[in-house]
Amino acid sequence: LGYGTGIYAENIGPGLPPGIVRQIHSLPRLHKQDVIIYHLSTGTALNYTLENYKGRKIIIYHNITPPEFFEGYSRHGVEMGKDGLRGMAYLSDHADYCLAVSEFNKKQLQKAGYTCRIDVLPILIPFRDYEKKPDRKIMSRYAGDGYINILFTGRIAPNKKQEDIIRMFYQYQKRYCAKSRLFLAGSYDGMEAYYERLQEYVQKLHLK
């Protein structure tokens, strides 16, 4: 459409091709006719400096995990959640338009004092990323032995409630299919205490 665009971030993941995303400090000077699309999620100093940039501001709100989920497991998680919620409230007077990924998130913004127009736009999933051939070694190890395999993918964290998945699997294995396996595929980096609690729960249920 002829618009000049760029993607800038505070932290850039290693999986992205070089040059696609640039560091926020390299953002050029903006003008009042520019538009900033700001992805609001966790606590960051950018929440308190966004107002200093010229141009209209569109905020995409992609949920902030309530800090109470991390109580007893991660002090960092608690502080990040609290700071994120404070930043979300601080930005309420600096948004010209908002997109929330769910009705729940829209209500969160309204409760935090946002008075601009807020629409809901669910997360668009690039299904092409999942069009991959399965790993042969894993398939040969777990396929064809008569077991039902149940897979959950996602970060191991209290807000994901993996204990509920384990509880569900326990009932499934006990009542319906003894020859079954549960895979929880995800990193527990920073959530080691929660991971240990899950291990204890598995032992308590005598699951293997």
Predicted regions and their residues:
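N-terminal subdomain of nucleotide-sugar transferases
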Residues: 1-11, 33, 89
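Short N-terminal targeting/anchoring amphipathic segment
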Residues: 26-60
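Membrane-proximal helix-turn-helix segments that form the acceptor-binding/catalytic region
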Residues: 65, 77-97
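Donor nucleotide-sugar binding/catalytic pocket of nucleotide-sugar-dependent glycosyltransferases
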Residues: 92-136, 144
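Conserved donor-binding/catalytic core segment of Leloir-type glycosyltransferases
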Residues: 99, 141-160, 166-169, 183
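Nucleotide-sugar donor-binding and catalytic loop/hinge architecture
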Residues: 133-149, 173-177
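A short, basic/aromatic alpha-helical/loop segment that forms part
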Residues: 157-162, 173, 189-192
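Nucleotide-activated donor-binding/catalytic signature segment of Leloir-type glycosyltransferases, i.e.
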Residues: 186, 195-208
